Amino acid sequence: MKAVVLAVALVFLTGSQAWHVWQQDEPQSRWDKVKDFATVYVDAVKDSGRDYVSQFESSSLGKQLNLNLLENWDTLGTTVGQLQERLGPLTRDFWDNLEKETDWLRQEMNKDLEEVKQNVQPYLDEFQKKWNEDVELYRQRVAPLGAELHESARQKLQELQGKLSPVAEEFRDRMRTHVDALRTQLAPHSDKLRESLAQRLAELKSNPTLNEYHTRAKTHLNTFGEKARPALEDLRHTLIPILDTLKTKVKSVIDKARETLTAQ
């Protein structure tokens, strides 16, 4: 029940992104999210791609062309894996530097959110209390009706529905009243949070350190590019022979087909 109340408050305030403020566990870092997504995506592409290549080579056309695509695919997969291993530390270092540079802003935003959380907590507690009271009242009023249905289900089904409908409507109306009251109570805090966020953004734009941060971010990107260049060059050198081999074999097949057509 408490999770429901918190979820309602989050919808009224800042949306699902504010959920981390109420979570006890630390949210997953940006680098971990990027790394996990990239790993899953690349693995899926490698697995599905290899299946397609294998199916093609097993076909009559694939056997006739004899391009050795599966062998080249495995070589490419190994090279990509090595590239991931070499770029992994560089990428993590880039994100670490970026997080350090923006840590002060994140701390200020967390302070604002924590202040709003403390201010709205009494309203959430009151909302939860009323919610529990109405749920218990509804349960007490419905329980006897359930007993009647159990005693003579077929005979009293229509009568039970007639008794239950007003109770359900009353419960629904009471819940709507509580939700509307909570929305009204939280509205000023929601406005305050939006104003605070707008103020932080304005301070960020006028802050002299913004240009310094931009320079640092550019430096980090340049450093990352310089360190990643050797690994990308290795990948390019690995791909060139594979592409040249495929090009030669395809050209040979086309030439043979042209000779066959000319002879006919």
UniProtKB/Swiss-Prot annotation:
What does UniProt say on post-translational modification here? Answer: Glycosylated.
Q: A GO BP term, please? A: glucocorticoid metabolic process
Q: Which organism does this record belong to?
A: Mus pahari
Its function, per the record, reads: Participates in the reverse transport of cholesterol from tissues to the liver for excretion by promoting cholesterol efflux from tissues and by acting as a cofactor for the lecithin cholesterol acyltransferase (LCAT). As part of the SPAP complex, activates spermatozoa motility.
Key word rRNA processing present: no
Which lineage ranks, top first, belong to the organism behind this chain? Eukaryota, Metazoa, Chordata, Craniata, Vertebrata
Q: Which domain of life is it from?
A: Eukaryota
- Database matches in Pfam families: Apolipoprotein
**Chain positions of sequence repeats:** 67-88, 89-110, 111-121, 122-143, 144-165, 166-187, 188-207, 208-229, 230-240, 241-264
- Matches recorded under InterPro entries: ApoA_E, Apolipoprotein_A1/A4/E
Q: What is this protein called?
A: Apolipoprotein A-I
User: Could you tell me the keywords of this UniProt record?
Assistant: Cholesterol metabolism, Glycoprotein, HDL, Lipid metabolism, Lipid transport, Lipoprotein, Oxidation, Palmitate, Phosphoprotein, Repeat, Secreted, Signal, Steroid metabolism, Sterol metabolism, Transport
Gene behind this protein: Apoa1
Modified residues annotated as Methionine sulfoxide in this record: 109
